[in-house]
Amino acid sequence: QRQMCIRDRIGSACSMAAAALAELHGMELDQIEYAAEVAMEHHLGLTCDPVRGLVQIPCIERNAVAAMRAINALSLANFLTYTRKISFDVVVNTMYETGRDLFSKYRETGEGGLAKYYTGKK
């Protein structure tokens, strides 16, 4: 049974993008880690509910939103690193635990979430 899916792929990609942006902006290591942590933590609990089993809705749109989140995480890291309470490692472990706890119908099955309610009719 799948434990990880879209939240992990998009969360990881967003996290890597935020860290890369922070590095390119010459930030310190703790700011880079904070950017990565903020980017990933906002994907915890995201359902994987591809409509009709395709990745158009909502997956591709979620990737676009994640790109903007990476930029937002960079901004937050620039100003709020000193206030951080949670480490990147804690967020990664929480992502794993959340994936294990999430009902299977929300794990790339097309049985829950948006996939359950979309009929294809207008």
Model-derived segments and spans:
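Short, small-residue-biased leader/transition segments that mark boundaries at the very start
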Residues: R2-C5
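Glycine/charge-rich, flexible interdomain linkers and switch-proximal surface loops
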Residues: D8-R9
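Functionally critical mobile loop/hinge segments
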Residues: C14, A19-K122
